[in-house]
């Protein structure tokens, strides 16, 4: 895996701005991303914008073609399934270590955070939801006390968050308390119970993501033959 480049202050500003637009659905899958337009909107030169887009491309959120430009990347079914295989391997290990190593204070913290995530999931504030959702999974990994594992898990969440937001705008979760149930399993202090709780959670997320992305899979295949032009996004079939 390539390491994302270090960003300057302006590059970081551009990175956060474009990433936020993707997560909020302002830049949907397949949408063209114009360096010129972003630079003008943010009042900066092309260089920091190009650095930001390069990092987003390395993270898998964007893709570029020579003489065609840059767009929000449309994943294939294999992309999504492969991503979740990796995520399951990483996060089940984090869950197992959490069950062994987390302190009582950390367990209480995670239970409260999970309740907040599930409460936000029943609202339409998806950006705030995603921030808390990423924080929850990051804290689980941090409590596993393995920095390399924590870093790897954090890298997987940008893509998952983007896919979760597809055709969002309503409630994000259909289950009553998915994250509270997850954390309760992790706090059982049994590594096997924690592992299965996380495995079930990730597999449920995969199923939900595949359903949300299904209309895009064929579009991603057909649009490969004609890369989307500037200012025009992908239109879903009715």
Where do the PLM segments sit?
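Short linear motifs at protein or domain termini
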Residues: 1-100, 105, 210-238
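C-terminal regulatory/effector modules of DNA-binding transcriptional regulators
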Residues: 41, 169-238
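Conserved amphipathic alpha-helical segments that form helical-bundle/coiled-coil interaction surfaces
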Residues: 79, 83, 102-166, 176-185, ...
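Hydrophobic residues in alpha-helical segments
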Residues: 22, 98, 121, 186-187
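Mobile beta-alpha loop/short-helix "lid" or hinge segments that flank ligand
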Residues: 57-63, 155, 170-173
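Residue-level recognition of short, well-ordered coil/turn positions
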Residues: 26, 61, 125, 190-191
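Generic structural signal for secondary-structure transition and capping sites
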Residues: 27, 92, 161, 165, ...
């Amino acid at each position: 895996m390539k390491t994302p480049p270090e960003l300057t202050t302006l590059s970081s500003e551009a990175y956060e701005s474009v990433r936020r637009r993707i997560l909020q659905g302002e830049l949907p899958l397949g949408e063209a991303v114009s360096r010129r337009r972003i630079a003008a909107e943010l009042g900066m030169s092309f260089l920091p914008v190009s650095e930001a887009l390069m990092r987003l491309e390395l993270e898998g959120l964007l893709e570029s073609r020579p003489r065609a430009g840059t767009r929000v990347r449309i994943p294939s079914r294999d992309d999504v399934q492969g991503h979740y295989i990796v995520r399951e391997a990483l996060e089940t290990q984090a869950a197992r270590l959490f069950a062994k190593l987390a302190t009582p204070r950390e367990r209480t913290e995670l239970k409260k955070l999970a309740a907040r995530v599930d409460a936000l999931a029943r609202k339409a504030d998806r950006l705030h939801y995603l921030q808390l959702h990423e924080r929850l999974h990051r804290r689980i990994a941090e409590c596993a006390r393995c920095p390399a594992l924590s870093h790897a898990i954090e890298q997987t969440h940008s893509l998952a968050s983007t896919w979760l937001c597809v055709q969002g705008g309503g409630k994000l979760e259909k289950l009553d308390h998915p994250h509270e149930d997850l954390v309760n399993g992790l706090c059982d202090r049994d590594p096997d119970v924690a592992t299965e709780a996380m495995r079930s959670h990730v597999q449920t997320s995969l199923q939900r993501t595949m359903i949300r992305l299904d209309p895009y899979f064929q579009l991603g295949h057909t649009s490969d033959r004609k890369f989307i032009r500037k200012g025009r996004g992908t239109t879903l079939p009715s």
